[in-house]
Amino acid sequence: MSSSDRPVRAARTKRSLYMEWAKTHSHAKYNLATSGLTGVSREEFPLDVRELEITAPGGYGHAPLLARLAVHTGVSEESIVTAAGTSMANHLAMAALLEPGDEIVLEQPAYGPLLDVANYLGARVKRLPRRFETRFSVSLEELQRAITTSTRLVVLSNLHNPTGALLSAQMVGAIGKLAIRARARVLIDEVYLEMLFGKPAPFCFPIGQSVAGAKENPFVVTSSLTKVYGLSGLRCGWILAAPALARRMWLLNDLFAATGALPAERLSVMALDHLEKFRDRARTLLAANRALLDSFLDSRRDIECFRPPAGTMVFPRLPHGRDPEAFFRLLREKFETTVVPGSFFEMPRHFRIGIGGDTPTLRAGLERLSAALDALTKR
């Protein structure tokens, strides 16, 4: 094994530089940094105050919410664990699966907090490259080489954050079979996957049940109502896992959250009862915004960009010889616009554009992004 193939156990980190940046530096008049759908207003939400409660008997999960999520995911309640958004779901899932020193294989580029949590938990991290030249796909051959008898967990996202690349059902099934042979698990963050809307979506948990047969499902899934539906404030996240593992996660969560916030859980039940309304809202908004994005990308010959089949984000690449940090500074200070610097995804020449905001803001933001690129070219 070469030195570059050896898993790395990084210094234990107790912060997320990306989340710190997002909370303190991403805000601008024209914010193209946010990857989720613009938030649902109080007027748009089907609020029934008669259904709200402040307190309820404790237990492992709010029964009405678990019932709704079982219908939504097509998974039995014994395999569902609720969490405060996908971020906490990822943390809880990884904490339940890993011990300090365990080997994991994690995609690269990756959403920063996934790597941060792995390092915080003391994992030895090997990287699985997802390359621009191959449309950020996963190479099954490279994954097979990366997995060893010591590998405890593989961590992926689908749709991929930051690129929006889609893992097909065939690829998900092949990854599941590989994990079963290696006696490893696969954590897939699917928080963006429901943006496929009417298209068949390769949700990995049922695929895992199919390929596992009598064996335990190798997949652990995390998701929430945040990104697709504009319901971030509810913090309605969940984990799908084999029943025994789900039970372990509930017990571990006693150390983290103990019980859920009942008013938010009741609001989440209301949201799930009217989810088609929020899905239609998202579909309509993204159809208009995708057209704006395509027009912008068609007009630029100075950036390269893989265009994913769905979702709210793309990950363009700046030309060689340009100073990315100077460009992001120019964009923010002169043009009042923010994107996410690629350095937060370990690819500093790239940047992430989010298209889930309101259409007028996106249109104006893309115009300013184009002007900033023109200014960069003239330097």
What is the role of each PLM region?
Residues 269, 285-294, 305-318:
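Conserved glycine-rich beta-strand-loop-beta hairpin in the small C-terminal domain of fold type I
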Residues 121, 181-182, 215, 300, ...:
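Helix C-cap/helix->beta junction micro-motif
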Residues 4, 215-287, 294-296, 367, ...:
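Conserved core segment of the aminotransferase class I/II
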Residues 132-202:
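Active-site phosphate-binding strand-loop segment of PLP-dependent enzymes
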Residues 11, 96-156:
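PLP-dependent aminotransferase-like
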Residues 2-88, 92, 273, 375-379:
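N-terminal small-domain helix-loop-helix segment of the aminotransferase-like
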Residues 145, 329-339, 345-379:
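PLP-dependent enzyme catalytic core of the Aspartate aminotransferase-like
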Residues 102, 123, 181-184, 190, ...:
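A short helix->loop->beta-strand "cap" motif at the edges of active sites that frequently abuts
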